[in-house]
């Protein structure tokens, strides 16, 4: 299946902010590290029939480059150093790093190459896959249906929050990777801009064009890669946390907690890390249980939780965000990142549950265990056992 009308992507910045934040850190600290990443469809969708159309889009991505106005805008942000931006200016996607195949109906994608380059593929490639699939499956759906669905949800949201002080409710768009389309995401974000509690987007292209704050710090791959970069597996998570602070000592300080598990993370997150990092991000497991653990941990360390921020981003919708806000708002600062339930929330459209995750670093296995068993990713069961032993984790979960 080929012949999609035009390139899905129009900007190198049409990606999540944390990709550029991590890429700069990799550029400065791990320039020669090699990685492999693989696509996973967590649902039962057979997407192999779209392999040729995806390949066309991958090949078209080599023509994307940082435009002068984009370069100038990035230069005005506090996150980036000149040497990195000069390098990014010359960056081009290399389609040879991407292998796309149809394996009896199953879509297989494997990415290999220098981490500093491979890191850029994940988010735009997932957005491409999502948009292509929805284009073929739901050709009559689009912006109008998405906007109608959002307006209906906002009416419910207003009723749900009528008795609440919403002055500390902060919502972000995290919807790039599984969006229905680029146009739908832009329309949804522009509508949300009218709400006082909407604070930004993870999409750098939208942030630039709509004058929004770009939101994001680091992803699982930052911690996964350190499982092989660090000489000692048991201290690899601490090495990842320290390296991030080395790159960003005073900003972008929200740490992702579930690459191993929340309990293993908190054992590594001592008073020095907890003091320097501005907060934590939840991405798997029970959110209330996680939040209670985070608050108790700060209190145990003598840190006032109200000086820290908890970011919730796992399978959220507006109703779940309000429930969490009710539970935690008086005890800690809060932000909520909603993705699929904003940018692919259309009646009769089934969002894709798709990911691309790191599987190797410097030719050796890495793993994500998480606080949700179904999210465990690793080929090498022996490495998963070693990882669990290194982090003193009791039960064994199946590696997928």
Swiss-Prot record:
Pfam families: NAPRTase, NAPRTase_N
Matches recorded under InterPro entries: N/Namide_PRibTrfase, NAPRTase_N, Nic_PRibTrfase, Nic_PRibTrfase-Fam, Nicotinate_pribotase-like_C
Residues annotated as signal peptide: none
Molecular function in Gene Ontology: nicotinate phosphoribosyltransferase activity
Phosphohistidine: residues bearing it: 220
Record GO cellular component, one term: cytosol
NCBIfam families on file: NAPRTase, PRK05321.1
Name of the protein in its database record: Nicotinate phosphoribosyltransferase
Source organism per UniProt: Salmonella arizonae (strain ATCC BAA-731 / CDC346-86 / RSK2980)
Organism placement in taxonomy: Bacteria, Pseudomonadati, Pseudomonadota, Gammaproteobacteria, Enterobacterales
């Amino acid at each position: 299946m080929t012949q999609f009308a035009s390139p899905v992507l129009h900007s190198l910045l049409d990606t999540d902010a944390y990709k550029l934040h991590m890429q700069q850190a990799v550029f400065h600290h791990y320039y020669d590290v090699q990685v492999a990443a693989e696509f996973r469809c967590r649902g039962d969708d057979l997407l192999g029939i779209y392999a040729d159309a995806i390949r066309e889009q991958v090949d078209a991505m080599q023509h994307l480059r940082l435009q002068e106005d984009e370069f100038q805008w990035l230069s005005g942000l506090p996150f980036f150093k000149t040497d990195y931006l000069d390098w990014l200016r010359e960056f081009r996607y290399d389609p040879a790093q991407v292998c796309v195949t149809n394996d009896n109906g199953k879509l297989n994608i494997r990415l290999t190459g220098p981490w500093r380059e491979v890191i850029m593929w994940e988010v735009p490639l997932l957005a491409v896959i999502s948009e292509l699939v929805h284009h073929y499956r739901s050709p009559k759906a689009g912006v109008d249906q998405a906007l109608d669905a959002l307006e209906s949800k906002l009416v419910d949201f207003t009723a749900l929050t009528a008795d609440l002080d919403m002055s500390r409710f902060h919502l972000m768009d995290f919807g790039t990777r599984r969006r229905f389309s680029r146009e739908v995401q832009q329309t949804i974000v522009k509508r949300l801009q009218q709400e006082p509690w909407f604070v930004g987007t993870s999409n750098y292209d939208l942030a630039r064009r709509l004058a929004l704050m770009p939101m994001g710090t680091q992803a699982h791959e930052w911690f996964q890669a350190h499982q092989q970069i660090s000489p000692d597996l048991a201290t690899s998570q601490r090495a990842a946390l320290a390296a991030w602070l080395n790159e960003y000592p005073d900003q972008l300080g929200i740490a992702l907690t579930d690459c191993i598990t929340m309990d293993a993370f908190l054992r590594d997150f001592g008073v020095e890390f907890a003091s320097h990092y501005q907060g934590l991000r939840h991405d798997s497991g029970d959110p209330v249980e996680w939040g209670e653990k985070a608050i108790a941990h700060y209190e145990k360390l003598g840190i006032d939780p109200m000086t820290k921020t908890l970011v919730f981003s796992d399978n959220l919708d507006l109703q779940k965000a309000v429930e969490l806000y009710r539970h935690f708002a008086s005890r800690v600062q809060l932000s909520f990142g909603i993705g699929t339930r904003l940018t692919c929330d259309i009646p009769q459209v089934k969002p894709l549950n798709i990911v691309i995750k790191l599987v190797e670093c410097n030719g050796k296995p890495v793993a994500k265990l998480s606080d949700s068993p179904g999210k465990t990713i690793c080929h090498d069961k022996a490495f998963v056992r070693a990882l669990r032993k290194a982090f003193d984790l009791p039960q064994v979960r199946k590696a997928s």
